[in-house]
Amino acid sequence: MTDRYKVYTKVLKVLKEMLTLSHAGHVLTLAMMIAGIVTGRNAQLSSVSAETATKAKDKSTEMRLRRWVKHTSIEADVVYMPFAKQILEALSALPLSLVMDGSQVGRGCMVLMVSVLYQKRALPLCWIVYKGKKGHTTADRHIEALTKVLPLTPAKAQIVLLGDAEYDTTEMLLWVKQQERWDFVLRTSPQIYVQEGSQSQPINAYPLKKGQVFQRHQVGFTQKATLSLNLVGWWSNRYDGPLYLVTSLDNGYQACKYYRRRFQIETFFSDQKSRGFHIHKSHLSEPVRLSRLLLAACLAYLWMVCQGLLVIAEKNVGLIDRTDRIDKSLFRLGLDWIRYALKLNLDFTPIFRLQFSHSLPDVR
């Protein structure tokens, strides 16, 4: 049995136990894609087909994968939903830090991704792929992405939404304020006006020196002052300039602590791109097809993070990393463990369910 076939059959067995799709062949092809992405570390369909354990020619396998990403009966949101719900349920004992961010994928397309933060990793929950270039998108699209999250969240979970200045639109903030148990910490532009009493001024008019944090409670946001929120100015000693945040949290220092975590979604995109699966080089240009490819790539990513957690839990880190500390990320630990297990013919089971642990050491 080849390494490729071993990975594929193990993934297929687990997926058959977890998924029921409209056609049995869809699960089989999804298993091919996940296995090929992991073993080849590349999400380009031609590369995935070359890694697939099948007697068919690589070109024939590639055409099968292309038919799969074109298939209208495969709804990425529906297939991924049970995995996303399990992630949030596993983490719901603590406030859930959700982060929204966009990145370029495929050819001429962008993905707007909503993820939950855990152990310096952003775990994908849902996404929207659309035609466009890097830059701001519409508030309606932001709300559409967040609406996809609502049926995934546990009933009593506390949620804190994080995002950069692209997401500080009045329309989206009003939507978030209508949701029960949702808070937000979003970066905003220093040029935006706020109203405090009868005074209106740009945010950067408030005095702020390096090493300082200031907070203004219940200021009117923008010159229209359609909603009131808390404003935080934060100039950390590690930053060249100040950051300005709008938040529903009363504690400015807590808002800064939350916002510092926002940058962890960059690790997800780098794992999906240059450090991992190179999904930005997939050459696909249709948003719906890219969304289905992202389904396979996100499941592969989730497996690697869960595998990394298991490596730590079973105290096997020293076999693939330093013995005195953990240098590798959860994602990289997972990837390297699969390679190590295949090299030594060790048994493993693909894991797509997050196991939360309070005792986990601080890892990337």
Please give the residue ranges for each predicted region.
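Short secondary-structure capping/turn segments at boundaries of alpha-helices and beta-strands
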Residues: M32-G36, S49-E51, A84-I87, V99-G102
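Single, function-defining residue in the core of a domain
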Residues: M1-N42, V79-M81, L91-L96, R107, ...
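DNA-recognition alpha helix
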Residues: L45-A56
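An active-site-proximal beta-strand-loop segment
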Residues: V99-V111
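Histidine-anchored nucleotide/phosphate-binding helix
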Residues: V114
